Amino acid sequence: MKSLFYFFERINFLTADFLLKKIRIGADNLKDVSSLDLFFVHMHHRGVAVHNIFLFLLTYVPFFKRAVLGCYLKKKLFIDHDLKNKNYFKMKRANALFFKGDFLTSNNFLRASTTFYNSFFFFLIRNHVITKTTLNAIYFSKGSFKPAETSYYFNAYVLHFFKKNKVNDFIVFLNENKIKDYWAYLTTIYASPEAQNLKLIDPVGSLIEQSNSYADRLPTRRTLRKPAPTQSSMSRLCILLFSLTTPPLKKLRPPLSLRLHSCYP
């Protein structure tokens, strides 16, 4: 819980800092805003409406109180992050906008000016905050893509991210040098011939088990089928000592029917 609380505090600070520094996007200040802002400019020019109030605030509101925004983040984004729940990510309508079009063709989504790069997912990464819960919550919207394609790109990144950082904690802070390494890795893996076959790798399931949120999940069939734990040597020793020190019970007399039966020849 401490890690989760610290994460919310950190995301509060980063988002509030982001809103305090930014002003309304215009043609004269495009160079001064982040790639997330540029993403909204890009979507605006393409005539795509943003339906989520949080994204709307990021675009048009120059100032927003930290407490209010933090409460919104907790209630709308990160509370219900179970992938089996339809409400696991309240921004999924807006998230789908990130992946409209053919952004996965010819590795175009790896370039800095593309929608994939400017998505809210990589906004979190560029601002040095990412958690296992966030990776499960900000799940790639399938949109017009096949499930195999979506799972491949998402899992390939997650797998390398946690291997590279040897992640054992709930929260990981990145720096710019590491992010450059990730981009180099992504460019290599997606350009390789193996990527064309979309070989699925699924580290997400094991990451969920390792995360702090796993304890709150309902038991699965695999969990219920686990064999009962064997007795330890200490347990066996205690049982032996108990049997040696406990006085033997008095022999019970046989029931009446048995005694009567024994009387017959």
UniProtKB/Swiss-Prot annotation:
Subcellular location: Mitochondrion
Coarse class of the protein's main subcellular location: mitochondrion
Keywords: Mitochondrion
Domain of life per record: Eukaryota
Cellular compartments per GO CC: mitochondrion
Name assigned to this protein: Uncharacterized mitochondrial protein ORF12
Organism, as annotated: Paramecium tetraurelia
Lineage of source species: Eukaryota, Sar, Alveolata, Ciliophora, Intramacronucleata
